[in-house]
From Swiss-Prot:
One of its GO terms (molecular function) is oxidoreductase activity. It comes from Pestalotiopsis microspora. Pathway: Secondary metabolite biosynthesis. It is an enzyme of class 1 (oxidoreductase). It comes from the Eukaryota. InterPro entries: Cu-oxidase-like_N, Cu-oxidase_2nd, Cu-oxidase_C, Cu-oxidase_fam, Cu_oxidase_CS, Cu_oxidase_Cu_BS, Cupredoxin. Its EC number is 1.-.-.-. Induction: The expression of the dibenzodioxocinones biosynthesis cluster is positively regulated by the transcription factor dibT. Signal peptide: none annotated. The keyword Protease does not apply. This is Oxidoreductase GME11365. Belongs to the multicopper oxidase family. Residues 72-188, 198-331, 431-571 form the Plastocyanin-like domain.
């Protein structure tokens, strides 16, 4: 019944979008002035006159409905040869690939079949959810969780194209396995012959993520056991000494290359902690996309891939076979100052399907020691579709900087506290799964009556205005007695929901008013690495009413409060939610979840301890 209802209301909602945002939304083009096939020699063209030059925030192709059905469950599997309790999607890890074309409508029905009393909700990472904030999948912000036995339907338009991923946003649930790739086919800024299956890089743990939460808040971050590529890895163990060691040593993911062909790789970090150095022996990358933003191609032999970041690269199969026809795919933590006991060799490029020998391992100096954890220079990430950043409308003094730190909890003035939580902009976020922000705004008719714990920043500005934010990772103890905030060494991958942001500047040390912003078509993406001890200066345009989370995508940091939410154009939120017809379902889900939580979770002691997101 809900399926047909959503279909019936879709055009009404699109019409409402157009009435609110006539300059930002137009109906898809229906004719072409020139026809070129999208193929190996014409990847810049799509269909019906659309191309890599089309502004995808203004025009999108007509599309079809693509539909998926997900069942979320738990089981013991051994992706690296060691039995681990994993949260699965359709009995798979990683979950099934969502595949669509630019302009399609994607419908995913998610059934919670968990037996551990946990709820769930799913986020479609990088999807703007333009005017569909209620489908963003963040418990306590855009929805209540779905309780065990419940089903939720997510339906949204693929207005962007490229590579993304989906994951549970229910606390630390995705660290336990609930994640998978999203591929939205569209034009490309460089030609290629073969589109390879997406590559999910995952740092992996052998115990339940929720059991590690207390280690995180007591300054003892748990280091992953190793790395998986597309759900495969190698863990050396002895089955005679450990019954959970069932198929040692596991296996590595293998990619077949055709000599002379150009292969498109879609690299996705679905990690929870590690920022990866990623390279392939004997091959270069032509980078063509960052997150969901197509860019001017540039060539490199290594990428730093932060948690939740994505890159599309073209790799030409032109290697020399001096040491054989197999080559290692490498991935390891980027910070040499924090050694990890991982094998960098996470996969294999294979030219000859009959050759199953291990590749040659080059000398240590070829592993890019000392390369660091910095994103590619923003000047290398030039978007194909240009944007000029306008003047900021929000306050922009040092008091407005979003500073990251740790503070004692629950008493911030207690230097001897054994518990510390992350702080962003003087707040440690804690949301209430039973009373999401979006629902509160609808009930209160757009009034922003939020608590400090909900970490709101209200953006009540006109459509088209720009807002600027500096995020600093080098916070010092300005009040060391009353507000001590030590900063451990860490990259922070900062992710914004509902928008791509422009990167105006990114650097080491303290942000200074003398830093000159790049306002002329700067790099854009949805996840940026805040350098260790550095800063990043971002901007985005007001055009998408809703409650949008911004958080560090290190799962442990977000769980310990390193997040906030932007309340964008609060007065326009209720009309959009009401026009969508989603409100009765929202109310029903919150009623069911609250009853489940109060009657099941609380008596069992399975209560929310972390931020909730």
């Amino acid at each position: 019944m809900l399926f047909s209802f959503l279909q019936e209301t879709a055009y009404a909602v699109y019409g409402l979008w157009a009435s609110f945002y006539p300059s930002l939304y137009q109906r898809p083009l229906s004719s072409s002035t020139r026809h070129l096939d999208h193929g190996p020699d014409n990847r810049g063209y799509w269909k019906d006159g659309f191309s890599i030059k089309t502004d995808y925030e203004v025009e999108i192709p007509e599309g079809k409905l693509v539909e998926y059905f997900f069942t979320i469950s738990e089981a013991e599997i051994a992706p690296d040869g060691y039995l681990t309790n994993v949260t699965l999607v359709n009995d798979q890890f990683p979950g099934p690939k969502i595949e669509a074309d630019w302009g399609d409508t994607i419908r995913v029905t998610v059934y919670n079949n968990l037996t551990n009393s946990n709820g769930t909700s799913f986020h479609w990472h990088g999807i703007r959810q333009f005017q569909t904030n209620y489908l963003d999948g963040v418990p306590g912000v855009t929805q209540c969780p779905s309780k065990p036995g419940d089903t939720q339907v997510y339906e949204f338009r693929a207005m962007q194209y490229g590579t993304g991923w989906y994951h549970s946003h229910y606390s630390l649930q995705y660290t336990n396995g609930a994640r998978g790739p999203v591929v939205i086919h569209g034009p490309s800024s460089a030609n290629y012959d073969i589109d390879v299956e997406p590559l999910l890089i995952t740092d992996w743990y052998h115990a339940d993520a929720f059991s590690y939460f207390h280690e995180e808040i007591t300054d003892h971050a748990h280091i992953p056991t190793g790395t998986l590529l597309n759900g495969k890895g190698v863990y050396e163990c002895d089955p005679t000494k450990d019954s959970r060691c069932v198929s040692p040593p596991g296996e590595r993911h293998t990619i077949q290359f055709e000599p002379g062909k150009k292969h498109k790789l879609r690299i996705i970090s679905s990690a929870s902690l590690a920022t990866y150095k990623f390279w392939i022996d004997g091959h270069n990358f032509t980078v063509i996309s960052t997150d969901f933003v197509p860019i001017e191609p540039y060539v490199t032999d290594i990428l730093i891939v932060g948690v939740a970041q994505r890159y599309e690269v073209i790799v030409e199969a032109n290697a020399t076979f001096e040491h054989g026809s197999n080559f290692w795919i490498h991935g390891t933590h980027c910070d040499d100052m924090i050694p990890v006991p991982w094998d960098t060799r996470i996969g294999i490029i294979q030219y000859d399907a009959e050759d199953n020998s291990d590749p040659y391992t080059p000398p240590l100096e070829t592993t890019h020691p000392g390369y660091g954890c910095r994103d590619p220079p923003p000047t290398s990430l030039v978007p194909i579709v240009p944007r000029q950043v306008g003047n900021n409308v929000n306050g922009f003094s040092p008091a407005d900087y979003l500073e990251i730190g740790l503070q004692s909890w629950p008493n911030i003035s207690d230097p001897d506290s054994t518990i510390r939580k992350w702080v962003l902009a003087n707040r440690t976020q804690y949301v209430d799964w039973r009373e999401p922000s979006l629902r509160k705004l609808v009930h209160d008719n757009g009034k922003t009556n939020f608590t400090q714990d909900e970490a709101p920043i209200v953006l009540d500005y006109e459509t088209g205005e720009w807002v600027y934010f500096v995020i600093e990772g080098n916070f010092t103890m300005r009040d060391p007695i009353n507000d001590p905030r030590p900063i451990p060494r860490s990259v922070h991958p900062i992710h914004l929901h509902g928008h791509d942001f422009a990167i105006l500047a990114q650097g080491d040390g303290y942000f200074s008013k003398d830093v000159v912003p790049n306002l002329d078509n700067p790099a854009r993406r949805d996840t940026v690495n805040l350098p260790i001890g550095g800063y990043v200066w971002i901007a985005f345009q007001i055009n998408n009413p809703g409650t949008w989370l911004m958080h560090c995508h290190i799962a442990w940091h977000a769980s310990a409060g390193l997040s906030l939410q932007f309340i964008e154009q609060p007065s326009k939120i209720k009309p959009l939610v009401e026009a969508s017809g989603i409100l009765p379902e929202m109310e029903s889900r919150c009623k069911d979840w609250t009853e489940h939580y109060n009657k099941v979770n609380i008596p069992l002691g399975l209560v929310q301890e972390d931020s909730g997101i």
